[in-house]
């Protein structure tokens, strides 16, 4: 049976921690979409691990890991991450990671193009990670891309990469890019990559009857190419549909869909953010929460929890339970606000707006809660939480239509987690 972990907001919710926890009993952990633009941080045995393209399940010693067909894979990052895990003591990680031969290759060329495209937008920048994800998915959709399996075939990467480079040079002029260097590197990868490449359908067949397959979502629903705050989104399907498509999952095998919700809101890069706090409150959240991007190091914008957004996210992903994260970051706030509705021209909106211009203009209706003003760091039992923290959590559950909050994060370590019987 399959468990899917998905971000319910703008990303950076803390998906890696619940994935790490659940992967301890999982036979297989998979990434379905996205690339090395993702960033998941896990603290285990006082060691901090940063994941980008690799699934977080590699920390679990008995968990096999798969990078699925829906992903885009930057191979230098793939090998660099594997080496970093080995240096931190995960000596056998390279034996437990595989890549679908149908996944797309993300080249350094794509990163160069990403920067040029972003620069051309001037004052309307999307705020991408600059990792080349958008151009790579564009080449995939235009049927110009290279698949992982083709890296193993002599001459295929060189032929296709020369065509891609010529096309981008015709569009942008001279590029700050060494074509011959990248071709040479991929000639080396032809042998180096061989042990990791699998036919996904055949590979997954061995796990069809497994009681525990875990899917680790990347990014989040509000960055989904179809359902997010377009065009300020990533270039893949980040919701449950993307997981099913990218991993060829049987929908009837899905046992649970876990939505990961941060106890407040953050966003990296450009785009609408109705509950953003450009003030001392936002700065306090940013400082206490250490809100800097794992992938880019950029400062995250911060604001209050937005239940309008979370309800919209739930209506698309159909969460069976919620993991509420970083509750402890709110410990020192005198009062805590939660967005419950949007108004436009004095009227409550009945649905989540599709247009970013509308989101920029909405008036946010808040419910205000008294803070608990005591530490929740490291608490592992529900009954030990302050009463005001419990009320805050129960309100979120009601606003989510009764979807239970089963896990509550109270700190960075794996052990800093409350698991409720719900």
Curated annotation (Swiss-Prot):
Mg(2+) binds at residues 12, 39. The active site is at residues 12, 40. The keyword NAD does not apply. GO terms for cellular component: cytoplasm. It is found in: Cytoplasm. Binds 1 Mg(2+) ion per subunit. It is an enzyme of class 6 (ligase). InterPro entries: Adenylosuccin_syn_GTP-bd, Adenylosuccin_syn_Lys_AS, Adenylosuccinate_synth_dom1, Adenylosuccinate_synth_dom2, Adenylosuccinate_synth_dom3, Adenylosuccinate_synthetase, P-loop_NTPase. GO terms for molecular function: adenylosuccinate synthase activity; GTP binding; magnesium ion binding. The keyword GTP-binding applies. Keywords: Cytoplasm, GTP-binding, Ligase, Magnesium, Metal-binding, Nucleotide-binding, Purine biosynthesis. Substrate binds at residues 294-300. Its cofactor is Mg(2+). One of its GO terms (biological process) is IMP metabolic process. It comes from the Eukaryota. Its EC number is 6.3.4.4. GTP binds at residues 11-17, 39-41, 300, 326-328, 409-411. Pathway: Purine metabolism; AMP biosynthesis via de novo pathway; AMP from IMP: step 1/2. It holds the Pfam family Adenylsucc_synt. It catalyses: IMP + L-aspartate + GTP = N(6)-(1,2-dicarboxyethyl)-AMP + GDP + phosphate + 2 H(+). CDD domains: AdSS (cd03108). NCBIfam families: PRK01117.1, purA. Belongs to the adenylosuccinate synthetase family. Plays an important role in the de novo pathway and in the salvage pathway of purine nucleotide biosynthesis. Catalyzes the first committed step in the biosynthesis of AMP from IMP. Homodimer. This is Adenylosuccinate synthetase. It comes from Ajellomyces capsulatus (strain NAm1 / WU24).
